[in-house]
Amino acid sequence: MSAKQDGSTAESRKAPHSYRERVNSTVELAALVYRPLTASGALLSILRGKLYRRRSVRNVLDVVAVRSISGGQGHSAESKVRVEYLTPAEGNANGNSISNISAAPCADIRGSSDTAATSSSPSTPAQPTLLEGRCKMCLLDPTVLKATELCPDPASAAQHCTPVFLLGAAVVGSHVTRQLEAAVQAGQLSRKAADLLQQLHERLAGGPSSVSLTEDTDGSEQPQGLPRAAAAPPPPSNKRRASYTGAVEVTFTPRAVELNYQAYTMSELLSMVLPLREHADLVALSGFEQVGHIAHVNLSAAHLPYADIIGQVILDCNETVSVVVNKVDAISSVFREFKMDIIGLRRRTDSVDGNVVAGADLDDAGEAGGSLTAAERQAIALEALSPTYSLAEARVHRLLTATVRQHGCSFRVPYNRVYWNSRLSFEHTRLVDRMRPGDVLFDVMAGVGPFAVPAAKKGVQVFANDLNPVAAQYMKVNAELNHLPANALHVFNMDGRDFLNSVLFTSVTRAADASLPGHLCTGRRHVTMNLPAIAVEFLDVFQPLSSTCAPASEQRCNASAAAVVNERWNHLPAHVDPNAIDRRTLFHVYCFSAAEDLITDAVRQVEVNLGYTLPPENIEETLMVRDVAPTKRMMCVSFTLPPAFWKNLLASRPGQGGEPGGAHAETASTLVEVEQAAKKARPDKM
């Protein structure tokens, strides 16, 4: 673990807060105000997809229209009467908010409306000069209508409301057209705004719905002109549209909306605060992997100067994230953990807009908090006994221990000390779903148990191994966390080859005492080897003795260099009953491939390291698990050991008169010769 020290981390964490001020802005929008409120269903249905959309911004507001007196000079007393649209909260604050919007003077409105009213039919409701009382305000998307497009004069549009118009089924269509045209001629309404109101009236009155906001060829919504002829009827729809048969009073007004960092998505914020245009090597961050409360990113060298800002943006946009870490080096350790820096940390004292935000603290016990299991407390106690133990390192360990839920199970993951990949959750589920109660699972590279724990919970007898002692310890923690029976999951901490040569061998050949766990299997034996960078190399334990090569023994961990890794599977004990050997044991081996023919290459990698050719009937399944890189895939080959292997093993039994490996030396040699042609993955891409 290469986490930053407390002092440097705290100092660098002060800088990112300034980015929030840099993204603050105010946007002027066109707003449609209407009453009565009972028309909301019909109007909002018509406006669906046309409203302003931004995170943390309400596009439909409850407002109160109240009269106020203008302080301007040169007007009559009557012309000084104006209207302000206040939200309830703003009304309580005496209208001091930036959101208080003033309407045009009454005299200006009456001048245009009186002309239209004189020619209206007796059945047409009287046109109001001002909206008063409770109203609804809908913020319109700028692609539909901009605030500067409300009136022909942009300066006037930014300061005043338009006149009040009557729309709907209770209003004669010719009257609507005349009042809109009069407002356009008087310079109180732009043609684009008039077109929009005409379209709203047609929809409210039940006219042709094709006279509406339509989509241009590029998919953007564009307002169309006033109707001149009847259009084709709308296509039938299964959705019931809300209807309103009364008159609706509407007006347009500009609305100032304050935007802060909460109004933007993570990708939008990063594109705003990072100088992407100034640096060609600086590209937008594609995303992150989340493991419990931890967000994991892989930053390039160009991103590193902005690591603290990136960490803060991730925290601000993801409430479930408390810690952000950056992968410093590639995975190179035999324990498969990687070095990381903490670039973002949400403290319990952090606040957003004055509100305290709950999160992790460096003194926390990670996400587990006070709910540690007995096995986890034991693991922590053992760590404290280490000669290299330090309180600061222990705090970091607790901070980076996450709780992950997957496949109906909970996993405690010490993320900085074990290997965990959340992108493999589907594969964990897929493989466990193949198993049935009564099966036995041998997980050679088990990690903290993403295969082992759900399989044991399903009723499968599990023998799980990992070379990493921390992973082995946390398998026990996760067994306790998921309330597994004591005999359901057996944990081992040894080299994978030793596990194959001991635990698996005694179970498959029934060489152990019948009373030992794993000897009896009423279902099928499964062997998982999920270490795609080098898992196929562990298959050398099954090679015939004649094909043993130096690299196999050189790569063996925690074993004598002089030992022959495949000796156990080439010498069958005399007391073993050949008929009791389980030849149906199914191996699931993972590897990487960059070849054009992924399936052929994956099988070839297995054959090269196994030392035997796999007949088609022994290959049960070969599939691509996921994309690792543009030209690199993770593969899984599920197979049983071929007849040639079992024939060689039986020939090695004392008293059979055979020489192990002799009958198949030619096949094995041929495979070993082409080993260099097999696609090998680099260990740092595990």
Swiss-Prot record:
Its EC number is 2.1.1.228. S-adenosyl-L-methionine binds at H428, D466, L467, D495, G496, N530. Monomer. PANTHER family: TRNA (GUANINE(37)-N1)-METHYLTRANSFERASE 2, TRNA METHYLTRANSFERASE. Belongs to the class I-like SAM-binding methyltransferase superfamily. TRM5/TYW2 family. It comes from the Eukaryota. GO terms for molecular function: tRNA (guanine(37)-N1)-methyltransferase activity; tRNA methyltransferase activity. One of its GO terms (cellular component) is cytoplasm. One of its GO terms (biological process) is tRNA N1-guanine methylation. It holds the Pfam family TRM5-TYW2_MTfase. Specifically methylates the N1 position of guanosine-37 in various cytoplasmic and mitochondrial tRNAs. Methylation is not dependent on the nature of the nucleoside 5' of the target nucleoside. This is the first step in the biosynthesis of wybutosine (yW), a modified base adjacent to the anticodon of tRNAs and required for accurate decoding. This is tRNA (guanine(37)-N(1))-methyltransferase. It catalyses: guanosine(37) in tRNA + S-adenosyl-L-methionine = N(1)-methylguanosine(37) in tRNA + S-adenosyl-L-homocysteine + H(+). Keywords: Cytoplasm, Methyltransferase, Mitochondrion, Nucleus, S-adenosyl-L-methionine, Transferase, tRNA processing. Residues 206-244 are annotated as: Disordered.
